[in-house]
Structures are given as structure tokens and as C-alpha cells.
Curated annotation (Swiss-Prot):
A Pfam family that the UniProt record links to this protein: Spt46
Tissue expr: Exclusively expressed in adult testis.
InterPro entries: Spt46-like
UniProt lineage: Eukaryota, Metazoa, Chordata, Craniata, Vertebrata
GO biological process, one term: positive regulation of acrosome reaction
Name of the protein: Protein FAM170B
Regions crossing the membrane: none
Length: 283
């Protein structure tokens, strides 16, 4: 019995055994037509080397492979989207909290100073104005606390907090680009030195940055809005207040511990006196 194989071009070739004829290069799928005497049977695809996988399963595995590749690259994008969303949420929550938060007051620490012979600086002590080698007399003045972003603490100096404030200050206070060039040309020769470079006979010195300011109002303005100049002393003042509060709590706790043994001794004294009186009566 002989079997005939026919390719897509319609050519027949008698064979003594089983022979496979491949399709033409133009075709995208391989198929073989097998003719037996008396019967005609068509097979969908020719066998390939390796395990036989049906067309539906091949499509399934290809889609699965493509999905796994997509999944392997998706976590980075999802994480970036999650980070941006979390940053947006934190920013919105901080803005809402900032609007709803009541203004708080903070103490600014300063000392009075004066110049000696126009060069040396003497600050105020308990005995009067003396050289800076002596212990100064520290004064306090309250100012409205600048609202900070949530998440900032004393241990982590809020660089992010300052960056947001600087950007907001630049967006609100910066003039137009054309006006900047005009001002630079006009004020190049008329520019005056900043007030903190001018030597004054009398002023107040900020304990945080050691800057001498002409008046107390200027000091409070510096303490509250110093972020406009690229730095802020408010974090230092908050840290000082926090440490003072912690020292006060430790001192109160120490006093309570000292008072508690004295109370116990006072309670034990009457009992000792009663016992001694009973012993004397027995004798």
C-alpha cells in the first residue's frame, strides 16, 4: 500500500515510507494533505520536533509568557505611581492641616549686645555689659510659629519643609524676569550692604545664628520669616524649648522621688514610737 503526500502547490510524490513535505516559504502555517486509497483525510498541522502542543494551548502559553513579562516590569511602575500618589496625598493632607491648625507661639532667645570702640562686642550679663567670655543674660520673646509640614520633627531637620517654603516664597515674592534684569541694572551701583553686616552701637543678638539685629522687632521678623533668606532659626528655638521642657519634667520627677522616701519615713516613725512605748509598759 502506497501513500501519497501533497503540498500546497498540488504536487504528488509516491513514497515507499512516510515522507514529510514542507510548505512553501510564502505560507505561514505548515499543513500536510494525506491521501489514502479510497479515503481522504486532512490533518490540521504537521508534527514538529519536540512535544506536540495544540494551537489553543500554544496561544495560551504565549499569552501567559507575555503576561509574565508585563508583570515582571509592572512593579516598578506601580511603585512609582504609588509613591507619587502617596506624595500627593501627604501634600494635600498637610495643606489641609495647615489651614485648619491654630497659630502657635514660640519663644525666640536673644541677648543684648553693644560695640566697644567700634569693633569688639560686649553682651549683657548679670553684672552689666562684659566681654563675650562671660555667661550672657538670655532674654525671651514670643512670635507666631511658622506652620511646618507634617512629618517633620526635631531630630530630622526638615529640609523638605524648607524646600517647600522656599518654593512658595519664590512663587509669591519673585518679580517678573524682565523686572529682575531691570532692577539688577539700576541697583548695581546703589546696592547697600545688608543690615547684619552694618556695625551698630547697640542691638540684639540671635542666640541661634549669632546675628546682630538693630531692634527686637527685626529679631522677631528674622525668627519668624528667616526662611526667606535660605535658613530658619525656628527649628533651633523649638529644640531649645523641647529640651527645657524635658529638663523640667526630669526635675519634677526627681523631686517626687525625693519626697516619697521622706513620706515613707514619716509614716514609719509613729509605728516605731508605738512599739517602743509598748515595750516600756511591759517592762
Amino acid at each position: 500500500m502506497k501513500c501519497y503526500f501533497t503540498d500546497h502547490r498540488g504536487e504528488q510524490s509516491p513514497t515507499d515510507g512516510t515522507t514529510l513535505s514542507l510548505t512553501s516559504p510564502e505560507s505561514t502555517e505548515e499543513s500536510v494533505e494525506v491521501f489514502w486509497p479510497g479515503t481522504i483525510q486532512r490533518e490540521g498541522s504537521s508534527p514538529r520536533p519536540g512535544p506536540a502542543i495544540p494551537r489553543e494551548e500554544g496561544l495560551y502559553f504565549a499569552a501567559r509568557d507575555r503576561g509574565m513579562r508585563d508583570w515582571s516590569s509592572s512593579p516598578s511602575s506601580e511603585s512609582s505611581e504609588y509613591q507619587s500618589y502617596s506624595q500627593y496625598q501627604s501634600c494635600c493632607s498637610c495643606m489641609c492641616d495647615e489651614d485648619n491648625a491654630a497659630p502657635q507661639s514660640v519663644c525666640a532667645f536673644y541677648t543684648h549686645v553693644q560695640t566697644v570702640r567700634g569693633v569688639a562686642v560686649a553682651w549683657e550679663t548679670e553684672a552689666g555689659f562684659e566681654p563675650v567670655t562671660r555667661k550672657p543674660r538670655i532674654h525671651e520673646a514670643q512670635f507666631i510659629k511658622r506652620q511646618r509640614w507634617n512629618g517633620s520633627s526635631f531630630e530630622m531637620a526638615s529640609n523638605t519643609d524648607m524646600r517647600w517654603d522656599l518654593e512658595a516664597c519664590k512663587s509669591n515674592c519673585s518679580p517678573e524676569p524682565e523686572d529682575i534684569d531691570l532692577l539688577e541694572c539700576c541697583l548695581q551701583e546703589l546696592r547697600e550692604p545688608p543690615d547684619w553686616l552694618v556695625t551698630t552701637n547697640y542691638g540684639v543678638r540671635c542666640v541661634a545664628c549669632c546675628r546682630v539685629l538693630p531692634s527686637l522687632d527685626a529679631l522677631l521678623e528674622h525668627a519668624q520669616h528667616g526662611i526667606r533668606e535660605g535658613f530658619s532659626c525656628q527649628i533651633f528655638f523649638e529644640e531649645m524649648l523641647e529640651r527645657r521642657r524635658a529638663q523640667g519634667q526630669a526635675h519634677d520627677q526627681q523631686l517626687e522621688e525625693e519626697q516619697s522616701p521622706s513620706d515613707n519615713s514619716e509614716c514609719s516613725r509613729p509605728q516605731g514610737e508605738v512599739l517602743s512605748a509598748q515595750q516600756q509598759e511591759k517592762q
